[in-house]
C-alpha cells in the first residue's frame, strides 16, 4: 500500500514503500513512522532550505532563522546540500562551512525537527559543477568498470564519513532524508534524462545505496525525487530504482 505524505512546503510529495532488511537505526525507523503518521492525519510539514545559515539581509549569523522570525519557531523540515563536501574542502556549494552544516543538522534533530539532504556533486569527468552537461558519458564513467569509478568511490566515501559524523552528544545518529540524483527527469544535471539511460540511472542509485550500506550508514531514508516533467505514472516510474532501496517517492 502506498501512503501519500506532503513532506515539504516546497512541493515534495512522498510515498513510503516496503523496504526489507534495511538494518535502519531506531531513529530512522522512527522518522519513517512519523512521516506515515503525518500522512494518516492529512497534515504536512513546512520546510526551508538552509534555514539557519543565511536569509534576507543576513548571512552566517548564529541562532537566526527567517522562518522563526516570522512564525516564532524553526521549520519542521530543514534541507541542506552536500555538494563540494566530496572534494574535501571546508565549505559546501552554498558556501556554508562544513562544521556549521554538521552542527545545524544535529541541532535541528535535537529540537525535534527533520533534515533532508541533497547532493549536487561536481561533474567527475569535467571537474565542473553538477549543471555541466557537456558530456553524456558521466554516469557510465562512475559505474563499476568506468574510468571515473575509483575517483567517484572516493567522493562517496567522503560523503559517507560526513553522514556517519552526524552524531548527537549521547551517540545517536541523526536520521536523514537523503535525496541524491534528484530532478533526473530534466536534463540540467549530469545524471539527467538525456545524459544517461534508465539502466545506468538505476545502477547509479543502487551503487550509491549499496556503498552507504557497506560503510555502515544506516540512518538514512532514501527518496526518489523526479522533477515535474512526467505526464503520467509510467513516465514518473521509468527510472525508479526499486522498492528494496527506496523509502519515499516525491517531486522536486
Regions found by a protein language model. Name each.
Residues 83, 87-218:
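Substrate-binding cleft of extracellular glycoside hydrolase catalytic domains
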Residues 78-80, 236-252:
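Aromatic- and acid-rich polysaccharide-binding/catalytic face
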Residues 13-14:
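C-terminal motif of bacterial Sec signal peptides marking the signal peptidase cleavage site
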Residues 178, 205, 218-235, 250:
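Cell-envelope/glycan interface and biosynthesis
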Residues 1-3:
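Bacterial N-terminal signal peptides that target proteins for export
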Amino acid at each position: 500500500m502506498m501512503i501519500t505524505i506532503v513532506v515539504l512546503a516546497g512541493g515534495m510529495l512522498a510515498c513510503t514503500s516496503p523496504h526489507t532488511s534495511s538494518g535502519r537505526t531506531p531513529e530512522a525507523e522512527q522518522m519513517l513512522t512519523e512521516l506515515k503518521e503525518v500522512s494518516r492525519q492529512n497534515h504536512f510539514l513546512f520546510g526551508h532550505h538552509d534555514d539557519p545559515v543565511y536569509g534576507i539581509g543576513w548571512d552566517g549569523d548564529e541562532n537566526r532563522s527567517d522562518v522563526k522570525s516570522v512564525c516564532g519557531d524553526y521549520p519542521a523540515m530543514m534541507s541542506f546540500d552536500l555538494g563540494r563536501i566530496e572534494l574535501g574542502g571546508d565549505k559546501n556549494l552554498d558556501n556554508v562551512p562544513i562544521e556549521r552544516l554538521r552542527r545545524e543538522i544535529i541541532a535541528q534533530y535535537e529540537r525535534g525537527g527533520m533534515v533532508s539532504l541533497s547532493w549536487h556533486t561536481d561533474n567527475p569527468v569535467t571537474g565542473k559543477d553538477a549543471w555541466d552537461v557537456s558530456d553524456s558519458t558521466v554516469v557510465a564513467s562512475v559505474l563499476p568498470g568506468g574510468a571515473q569509478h575509483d575517483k567517484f568511490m572516493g567522493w562517496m566515501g567522503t560523503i559517507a564519513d560526513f553522514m556517519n559524523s552526524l552524531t548527537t552528544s549521547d551517540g545517536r545518529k541523526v536520521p536523514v532524508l537523503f535525496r541524491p540524483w534528484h530532478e533526473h527527469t530534466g536534463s540540467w544535471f549530469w545524471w539527467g534524462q538525456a545524459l544517461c539511460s534508465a539502466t545506468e540511472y538505476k545502477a547509479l542509485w543502487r551503487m550509491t545505496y549499496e556503498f552507504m550500506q557497506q560503510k555502515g550508514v544506516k540512518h538514512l531514508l532514501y527518496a526518489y525525487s523526479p522533477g515535474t516533467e512526467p505526464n503520467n505514472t509510467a513516465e514518473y516510474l521509468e527510472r525508479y530504482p526499486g522498492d528494496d532501496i527506496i523509502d519515499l517517492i516525491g517531486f522536486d
